[in-house]
Amino acid sequence: VVKQEVMNEKVKEEITGQLEITKVDANNTNKILAGAVFEIWKDGTKIDTLTTNKSGKATSKKLEPGDYTLKEIQAPEGYTLSDKEMKFTISNEKIEVVKLQITNEKD
């Protein structure tokens, strides 16, 4: 007779988040803007670089919980580069999508 004891341990689900950017004209938020380039930073390290597509959207997936800074490094053609840094947090409580709508002024 062979006895074997098996123990199963529930693996904790990895919690990650996403950042979804929508880039629009400052004076007409219905006008979407493609070609804006952003960098995501965490603790002084660049995590990702995103470029908005023809729908004015860019998404970064699998962001670990923590505090991040989003910096625009290239404005869409004909628009002024924003010098604002946007802070956002990915929660360690649940999987989430952080959505930011960001505007640019025309040149």
Describe each PLM feature range:
Residues 1-107:
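Solvent-exposed loop/turn and edge beta-strand elements of beta-rich ligand-binding domains
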